[in-house]
Amino acid sequence: MIKEYNEIVLLVDKPKKGLMRGDVGIVVEIYDNHEGYEVEFMTKEGKTVAVVTLEAHEVRPIGNKDMLHVLELELAA
C-alpha cells in the first residue's frame, strides 16, 4: 500500500506537466481511501518540477528491483 512520503513510479505520460512514464515522485497527500494521490516530482537538488494529482491506476510503489535513470531537464530560471 502506498503511504504518505513514499516514492512512486508514474505509469503514464503527462506531457503537459513535463512528466514521462517511469518518472519517480513523492506522495505528499492521499485522497479518498487511496483512490488518488498528490505527488511531487523534483530534481536531485530538490527543485520542484511538478506537483500533480494522480489516480491510483496512474502510479505504483517503487520496488527494490527498479532501476532509476537520469533525465536532464531545462528548467526556467
Where are these regions (language model features)?
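Long, low-complexity intrinsically disordered regions
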Residues: 64-77
